[in-house]
């Protein structure tokens, strides 16, 4: 399928997919699938609620060779990474969960820097409704 571009107010818009949708596929097969649909970009889940089935941030941050192979897998298909995704709750009233989500967000920021990306998709977080809260206080609806 040929890559197509949509325009909005005269500017070209690239089309992409949240690669987590193909989380049951190996990374390279998921990239091939995205490319076969004529897409230009992928948003990659790097932990927290989206999971990290295609991206081990710890390994990529520690190994320049693994980071290069990861980046090359995307670029060799004519795709680009539009964003890293790490939706979580760094303000969760459970201190262990909040700390884990903050660590994932921090690693996403460090990985984005190494990949030359300027976009990370995340949640700001939602605290509990008081000092003894055990869960976040979602005012309008629960998620996830």
Q: Model segments located where?
A:
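Active-site acidic/histidine proton-transfer and metal-coordination neighborhood
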Residues: 28-29, 33, 68-69, 73-80, ...
């Amino acid at each position: 399928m040929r890559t197509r571009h949509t325009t909005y107010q005269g500017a070209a818009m690239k089309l992409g997919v949240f690669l987590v949708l193909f989380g049951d596929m190996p990374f390279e097969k998921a990239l091939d699938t995205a490319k076969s649909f004529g897409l230009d970009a992928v948003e990659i889940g790097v932990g927290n609620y989206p999971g990290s089935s295609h991206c081990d941030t710890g390994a990529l941050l520690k190994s320049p060779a693994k980071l290069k192979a990861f980046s090359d897998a995307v670029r060799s298909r004519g795709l680009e990474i539009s964003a890293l995704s790490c939706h979580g709750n760094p303000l969760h009233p459970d201190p262990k969960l909040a700390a884990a989500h903050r660590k994932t967000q921090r690693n996403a920021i460090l990985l984005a820097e190494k990949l030359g990306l300027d976009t990370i998709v995340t949640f700001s977080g939602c605290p509990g409704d008081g000092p003894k809260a055990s869960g976040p206080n979602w005012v309008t609806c629960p998620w996830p």
